[in-house]
Amino acid sequence: MAITKQDVLEFISGLSVLELSELVKEFEEKFGVSAQPVAVAGGAVAAVAVEEQTEFNVIITDAGDKKINVIKVVRALTGLGLKEAKDATENVPSTIKEGVDKETAMNAKKELEEAGAKVEVK
């Protein structure tokens, strides 16, 4: 008895998501195809959607002359102990906040700059 398309569809519908993912990868390898959608060229040039960054890192690039003030702010922002905050301030560039939202990153940057540090937000 020959296997029909309906038999294949019924079998595939019974697979888990992980099994489906593995099956797609095997199809891509065996037949040299990609599961990515093909972009259709139109008469007008399509605008590329720019993905807005949602997670930011706050990095001290220079502690400046007022290191004690910067250390205090680093401790307040991170909850680090005195030694860890001092090390983070002296061993620049040093990431103070990682994976935070834009507002938190900008507030941290403002506080650190007011204390005398030079800061980057990436």
Swiss-Prot record:
This is Large ribosomal subunit protein bL12. It comes from the Bacteria. InterPro entries: Ribosomal_bL12, Ribosomal_bL12_C, Ribosomal_bL12_C/ClpS-like, Ribosomal_bL12_oligo, Ribosomal_bL12_oligo_N_sf. GO terms for biological process: translation. Keywords: Ribonucleoprotein, Ribosomal protein. One of its GO terms (cellular component) is cytosolic large ribosomal subunit. Belongs to the bacterial ribosomal protein bL12 family. Homodimer. Part of the ribosomal stalk of the 50S ribosomal subunit. Forms a multimeric L10(L12)X complex, where L10 forms an elongated spine to which 2 to 4 L12 dimers bind in a sequential fashion. Binds GTP-bound translation factors. One of its GO terms (molecular function) is mRNA binding. Gene3D superfamilies: 3.30.1390.10, Single helix bin. Forms part of the ribosomal stalk which helps the ribosome interact with GTP-bound translation factors. Is thus essential for accurate translation. Disulfide bonds: none annotated.
